[in-house]
């Protein structure tokens, strides 16, 4: 085994603007133009946008109406999830022909175990070249000693990036980056870190563990410090079966207005159903979660006859459950969930990367959320 292969154990491969790139294969005349893939309904959300559209602030999960306002000249295409799943299978078949152990974490991304490869860099160069030649898709690759370094590296120079980092190099390169660069540290967690004066990854990584533990508890406090130092022990394994998917929102202030609660719930069901549709998943049990201002928590669920990922169906059930519960106190957190999922498609395990968005529950639950993607 070479010294390189001993240090560089994991690659993260991420297809660039996956849905848009597939559409551009069918519509090459649109190359170089701002393109948005989104539904056409009044509450449709963006599934992905070309890099030309992203320059205008358009991003995934954004309401399509807002995306059109930000970039009125964009070409908007309806999503074709059947074609996207077929393209994903094609890409992952190529990946598995090059690397024995692969953990698929989405239609467009996977972790690859590079252990035993004599030259990981050369192997990954050959892989992305073959993917490009056979599918006309570009991929960004990050290579490192663990999944966390590989993931952040693959995002660093998109599109068509190829970044190789040791853990020490990652610490140096991203020392001045905001904590939210690292999966598992979302906006609310970053705000809580800022209250301690910790506004960069370098500062979080160098902070006394006791200070983090005092603020976040023994499990999350230790984990945040480790992630900021790009320390990670997760192993690459086969994708686990997902049995449910959810969206939750912790409000900036307690909400009593029923109309605002309904609007928030509708937005979350839009995002949730777009993800279910994208990954070929449907479920029978639809539920809501409500946490009140006194931190009491209630859940309500209803099981329908046949699995669905239809946004109108899921929204209808979720809104009915909310109306039946009729919270008597202001609401701190609201969530929606679809369970009993069935799917043959590759899975995306995580939904939330923010500790606070995960529901202000105990640290063990938060850590479960943080560990899903990396």
Positions of the model-derived regions?
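Extracellular/lumenal ectodomain signal focusing on beta-strand-rich modules
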Residues: 109, 333-335
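DNA-contacting surface of Y-family translesion DNA polymerases
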Residues: 3-5, 174, 181, 189-333, ...
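Gly/Gly-Pro- and Ser/Thr-rich, intrinsically disordered tail segments characteristic of DNA damage-repair
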Residues: 1-223, 342-374
């Amino acid at each position: 085994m070479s010294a390189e292969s001993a240090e560089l154990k994991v690659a993260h491969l991420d297809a660039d603007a996956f849905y848009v790139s597939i559409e551009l294969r069918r519509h090459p005349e649109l190359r170089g133009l701002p393109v948005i893939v989104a539904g056409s309904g009044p509450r449709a959300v963006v599934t992905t946008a070309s890099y030309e559209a992203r320059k205008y602030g358009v991003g995934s999960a954004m309401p399509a109406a807002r995306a059109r306002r930000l970039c009125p000249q964009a070409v908007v295409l309806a999503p074709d999830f059947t074609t996207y799943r077929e393209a994903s299978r094609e890409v992952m078949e190529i990946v598995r022909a090059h690397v024995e152990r692969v953990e698929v974490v989405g239609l467009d991304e996977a972790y690859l175990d590079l252990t035993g490869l004599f030259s990981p860099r050369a192997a990954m160069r050959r892989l992305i070249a073959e993917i490009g030649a056979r599918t006309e898709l570009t991929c960004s690759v990050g290579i490192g000693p663990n999944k966390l370094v590989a993931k952040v590296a693959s995002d660093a120079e998109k599109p068509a990036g190829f970044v190789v980092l040791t853990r020490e190099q990652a610490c140096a390169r991203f020392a001045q980056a905001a904590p939210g660069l690292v999966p598992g540290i979302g906006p609310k967690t970053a705000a809580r870190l800022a209250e301690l004066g910790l506004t960069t990854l370098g500062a979080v990584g160098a902070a006394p563990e006791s200070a983090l533990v005092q603020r976040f508890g023994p499990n999350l406090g230790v984990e945040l410090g480790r992630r900021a130092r790009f320390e990670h022990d997760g192993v690459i394994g086969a994708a686990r079966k997902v049995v449910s998917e959810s969206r939750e929102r912790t409000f900036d202030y307690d909400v009593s207005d029923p109309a605002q609660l309904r609007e928030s719930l509708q937005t979350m069901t839009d995002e949730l159903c777009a993800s279910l549709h994208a990954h070929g998943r449907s479920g029978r049990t639809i539920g809501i979660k409500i946490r009140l201002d006194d931190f009491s928590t209630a859940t309500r669920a209803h099981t329908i006859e046949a699995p669905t990922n239809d946004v109108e169906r899921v929204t209808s059930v979720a809104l009915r459950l909310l109306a039946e519960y009729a919270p008597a106190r202001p609401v701190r957190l609201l969530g929606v969930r679809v369970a009993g999922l069935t799917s043959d498609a590759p899975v995306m395990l995580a939904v939330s990367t923010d500790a606070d968005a995960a529901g202000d529950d105990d640290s063990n639950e938060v850590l479960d959320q943080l560990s899903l993607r990396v």
